[in-house]
Amino acid sequence: MSSIFETVKLFKSDDPFIIPKNILNLDSFEFDGLEGKTNLREMLDSSYTDAFVILKDSNIIFEEYQNEMKDNDLHLMNSVSKSFVGMLIGILEEKQKLNSKDKLRKYIPELQNSAFKETSIQHALDMTAAVKFSENYLDPSSEFWHEAAVVNWRQDLRERNSPKTLLEFMANLKETSQKEFEIFDYRTVLTNILALAAERSCETKFQNLLQTYIWDKLKAEYESHIVSDESDFPYMGAGMNASARDLAKFGLMLMNDGAFNNEQIVPKNWIKSTLEGSIEHKDIFLKSEYGLRLPGFHYKNQIWVGNPETMICIGIYGQAIYVDQKNKVVIVKLSSHPCLLYTSPSPRDNPASRMPSSA
């Protein structure tokens, strides 16, 4: 990724944490897919898998790489990136660097005359802001693709007067499509705004905050590269790249209520709040286009929550971190799916394919 696009870097640890292994042969392990019974080997070989890691009781019990990917290779995470932002906001709130009830414009005054004038940090965290923003990946002219063009993902959409930075793009959004906290509507721009609010609140580059408060604490084995705009501001809505093992450590942290390697990284009450949501969160999720597709789910703090003990971080082309606190299981799947997962011609073997087309 760094050879094609501008990126910023998170550095690996000088003393990396190595997850212990207890490898099992799980090829024939059966489970219920969307089209009936399947097994792990069939799922892996038919769902464009690049990397797949299972942890049980904090040990790696299965690890496999396909399509010439190796354990030290970095993979585009797409929207899995968002969950790192959500957890960092919780850390900064505990450190009193910001308050999730505050309006975004308190930290980003350039948004005073934009669609985000009344949007709070929490509204952005929960994807309930008022801004009109199409996340339709199938529409080449949607706002999602115009934002992605800022980091050169769609150079064909860039014109002489196009925004040069993500901040400029955000400030140019003027229209709203709903009231604040009226309905859940998934929009990548909200994650990028959160990253900028974090940066402004600490007067420190976002990538440095992520390095200090999360990446260093996870004792990462490998670097992470994040696609960035011309100002070196990272495209955190979808642009982070990391190894499967380092993502597994992030999953372990979530599984252990924000703790990793005997250190509390994310506040325990932030994880608790994420998992529990509220009646209002569940109601506005149910009223959204996602409600019928994901019954019982809610979305809070940039995490998809299936029940009070299960969290999912997910990217649209087959990237996911699945966290099951009750059973002490973490699963990382990194894929290069050719289709949006929800519209995939063969989604039966990938639980993430239950997700709608904007993730």
Please identify what each model-predicted range represents.
Residues I60-E64, R105-K106, P140-K179, T204-E223:
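Short, charged, amphipathic alpha-helices and their helix-cap/turn boundaries
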Residues M1-K70, K97-L98, L125-D126, A130-K132, ...:
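N-terminal leader/targeting segments and the immediately adjacent pre-domain N-terminus
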Residues S353-A359:
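Hydrophobic alpha-helical segments, chiefly the membrane-spanning helices
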Residues Y342-D349:
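Conserved small/polar residues in nucleotide/adenosyl-binding loops
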Residues A220-V227, L275-V330:
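Active-site Gly/Thr loop motif
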Residues S58, L76-S100, A124, L194-A198, ...:
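Active-site SXXK
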Residues M127, V189-A197, G239-A259, Q319-S335:
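Active-site-proximal alpha-helical segments within enzyme catalytic domains
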Residues L76, K95-N136, N172-E175, V189, ...:
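Active-site helix/loop module of the DD-peptidase/beta-lactamase fold
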